[in-house]
UniProtKB/Swiss-Prot annotation:
Keywords (A to Z) from UniProt: Cell membrane, Membrane, Plasmid, Transmembrane, Transmembrane helix, Transport
UniProt subcellular location: Cell membrane
Database matches in PROSITE patterns: MFS (PS50850)
Summary of the function given for this chain in its UniProt record: Component of the tartrate utilization system and may allow entry of tartrate and tartrate dehydrogenase.
Gene: ttuB
One of the record's GO molecular function terms: transmembrane transporter activity
Membrane-spanning residues: 17-37, 47-67, 82-102, 113-133, 139-159, 177-197, 242-262, 275-295, 314-334, 350-370, 395-415
Name of the protein in its database record: Putative tartrate transporter
Entry's family note: Belongs to the major facilitator superfamily. Phthalate permease family.
Positions of disulphide bridges: none
Keyword presence, DNA damage: no
Lipid bilayer topology: Multi-pass membrane protein
Pfam name, any one: MFS_1
Broad class of the protein's primary localization: membrane
Length: 433
């Protein structure tokens, strides 16, 4: 009976929550990286060098870093529904204002404010999932949610490329139309969040009483079973495992946002139109979505996290190194596909680790710390790519630099599993009935 009840409850909460938060993350990721498509013509229109563009694209993560932990602590206090709605509405407004950038100062200021507005969204969702799904199911659920990132590349790239072709309509440049149109869904969905999301299982009126009682009891028992798990905010901030995971995420973020922000310009160097760039940039994401889900399921099935992160990081590093020697659209496409698969596959097992040893306010602070420090890689990676491109005239040096960061991420993950293990980087494997 319990087996049937568990299956029914998990299916119901998955269908209720996961597709919706996937949609939210799809919009969030698109608004973060559409700057890469804007650069195809915006840089020339506004006279931006590669260095200026790289710093402006990356400065988003400085604002994100400064406000990430406070934002997640507020979410833990006021509830996911209200705070995620606030985050989405404000970031949608700021993203739309990007259409009116006039020069370097306004570019830097608005990208910084976009990071401030969006701070807390991603770790807030990770924390939110820990309220609803048992640890043994979390990597697979996280993978489905995080598949929205490569999906936003698959679907968003052609859309962004097409919107760039609206150049001159009503006197606006194509990149201005892209910012305005792609910002609107965030504001609309922010309002929908207020009416759709449920903060905690205890408040889930869409579950029957038996289903709700089972879920609350299961999640409470899991929290109690952690025993030595840290609960205070300070413990979440000071835990050496949190700092180590932040370093790992730093490298993967550098890879992710180097890919998202610079890939359109790397592809554009082969003489393609914005629309062609959009369709080609979409291809790697198709493979990444499938690989991410399969990799996370394997991680859950075996109960292993460490090597799933290490292998994925090394694959992405190989892809970046391969991209430095790409001489055709086909070879650069293979390289970008390897990077996409590696980066995407690293995320679900990595983000399943913090909630194994943290709970309550410590989890809120710890997850936000990992995300905020780690996302500084999203500043360092794109900024270094731009500076090295201006200095050397080539993307190669910057790509090698980011590949090196991913190798460091793999090494730190291995060291962490041996010096500060939590079940040796393993959880109880999923029992398939």
């Amino acid at each position: 009976m319990n087996s049937d009840l568990e299956t029914r409850v998990l299916r119901k909460i998955t269908l209720r929550i996961v597709p919706f938060i996937m949609l939210l993350y799809f919009v969030a990721f698109l608004d973060r990286v559409n700057i890469g498509f804007a650069a195809l013509t915006m840089n020339e229109d506004l006279g931006f060098s590669s260095t200026v563009f790289g710093i402006g694209a990356g400065i988003f993560f400085v604002g994100y870093f400064l406000f990430e932990v406070p934002s997640n602590l507020i979410l833990n206090k006021v509830g996911a529904r209200i705070w995620i709605a606030r985050v989405m509405i404000t970031w949608g407004i700021v993203s739309g204002l990007m259409a009116f950038v006039q020069g370097t100062t306004s570019f830097y200021a608005l990208r910084f404010l976009l990071g401030v507005a969006e701070a807390g969204f991603f770790p807030g969702i990770i924390l939110y999932l820990s309220f609803w799904f048992p640890a043994r199911r979390r990597a697979a659920v996280t993978a489905i949610f995080m598949a929205a990132a490569p999906l936003s590349t698959v679907l968003g790239s052609p859309i962004s490329g097409a919107l760039m072709e609206m150049h001159g309509f009503l006197g606006l440049a194509g990149w201005q139309w892209m910012f305005l149109i792609e910002a609107a869904p965030a504001v609309i969905l922010g309002v929908v969040v207020l009416f759709y999301l449920t903060d905690r299982p205890e408040k889930a009126k869409w579950l029957s009483e038996d289903e709700r009682n089972w879920l609350v009891k299961t999640m409470n028992a899991e929290q109690a079973a952690k025993g030595k798990a840290s609960h205070s905010i300070l413990a979440g901030l000071a835990d050496i495992r949190v700092i180590a995971l932040a370093l790992v995420y730093f490298g993967t973020s550098a890879g992710l946002y180097t890919l998202g922000i610079w890939a359109p310009q790397i592809i554009k160097e082969f003489g393609l139109s914005s629309l062609q760039v959009g369709f080609i940039n979409a291809v790697p994401g198709i493979f990444a979505v499938a690989a991410m889900v399969l990799w996370a399921r394997h991680s859950d099935k075996t109960g292993e996290r460490t090597w799933h992160v290490v292998g994925a990081c090394l694959l992405a590093a190989v892809g970046l190194a391969f991209a430095t020697g790409a001489t055709s659209v086909f070879t650069v496409l293979i390289a970008l596909t390897l990077v996409n698969i590696g980066i995407s596959c690293s995320k679900p097992p990595l983000w399943s680790m913090p909630t194994l040893f943290l709970s309550g306010p410590a989890a809120a602070a710890g997850i936000a710390t990992i995300n905020s420090i780690g996302n500084l890689g999203g500043f360092v990676g794109p900024s270094m790519i731009g500076w090295i491109k201006d200095t050397t005239g080539s993307f190669a040096g910057g790509l090698y630099f980011v590949a090196g960061l991913l190798v460091v991420s793999a090494i730190v993950t291995l060291v962490l599993s041996r010096t500060a293990p939590e079940n040796g980087g393993k959880v109880a494997p999923v029992q398939h009935r």
